[in-house]
Amino acid sequence: MLISKSIFLVEDDKEDQEFFTECIDDIENATIYGVANNGREALDKLENSTKLPDMIFMDINMPYINGLECLTAIKKNTRLKDIPVVMLSTDTGQAQLSCILGAKAFIKKPADCKLLHAKVEQMINLDFIIDSKIANQSFQFAY
């Protein structure tokens, strides 16, 4: 049996927060670590937390600090850089830039729960099989 992984959701849209939270709650090996409404709030929570999430699902288009800026800050922070980040957006044109900036995967919104479940399970299994530093080298696109 795999150990449950915590997922930090960074999403400004309340309906999307509810959708992703419900989908993640339905995944046997995943729990919600917390929710942030924008990149600034996410960085504050991560930098002030003693226990970090196992992975982050983050929207790109958000106020204050957008998802790409937040991803860049996470990857520059020695304490946070190894947390796998999955970027979420309606704009598939952002997938390549997300990869270049260090995201492990990209999911096109609106997503469906089946796709989200498959991606989370895939990442949990990959992390279980391979050391996370090696696993972070692969990038996956889903839509």
Language-model segments: which ranges?
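Conserved acidic carboxylate
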Residues: E11
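Alpha4 helix (beta4-alpha4-beta5 surface) of REC/receiver domains from two-component response regulators
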Residues: E69, D91-K108, L115-A118
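Helix N-cap/capping motif at the beta->alpha junctions
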Residues: V35-D44, G67
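Receiver (REC) domain active-site loop signature in two-component systems and cognate sites
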Residues: M62
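C-terminal output helix
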Residues: A111-Q122, S132
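Active-site beta3 strand of CheY-like receiver
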Residues: T50-F57
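Two-component/phosphorelay signaling modules centered on CheY-like receiver
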Residues: K14-V35
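Short amphipathic alpha-helix used as the core "switch/output" element in two-component signaling
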Residues: D44, L68-K81
